Amino acid sequence: MPAIEGPDGLIDGLCAMVELETGAFAVRTRARYVLFLELAGDPELGEPLRRQRREFEEGTEAIVVAVGISDPVPVTQAIMALGDGLLLHRLTVDPDLDIRPAIERAVRGLTVS
């Protein structure tokens, strides 16, 4: 994966991820959400999924830090929540939603110091 530089790179990267996860990998993404929901009440069985999620969060936080965003933890949490919302929206309600405006607005708002 190429290095993500600056807010524009973060926007492009997030858009590409949502497009991929709701396009070519849509079946896998739906299955992952089904598993998350089904295993939410079972700490032991759900641990492998939660571990993968934590690894994804750590990777996202590393990108946020590399982009130069101060206070990376809440920014990472917000980006992850936005990503989840956009993924679910595209998979269930509006598969053709133009995600770029929402991602741009969020990233620009989160990168203001």
Regions from the PLM with identified roles:
Residues V27, A31, P48-E55, G59-A62:
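Short, solvent-exposed amphipathic helices
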Residues L45-R50, R54, V65-S113:
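Hydrophobic/aromatic-rich alpha-helical bundle segments in the mid-to-C-terminal region
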Residues D12, G23-G46:
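Amphipathic alpha-helical segments used for helix-helix packing
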Residues C15-V18, F36-L37, E61, V65:
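Amphipathic alpha-helical segments within well-ordered protein domains
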Residues M1-T29, T76-I79:
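Hydrophobic alpha-helical connector segments
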Residues M1, T29, T60, L87-D94:
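Short amphipathic alpha-helical interaction/hinge segments
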Residues E21, L39-A40, L86, R90-L91:
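Generic structural signal for hydrophobic core residues of well-folded globular domains
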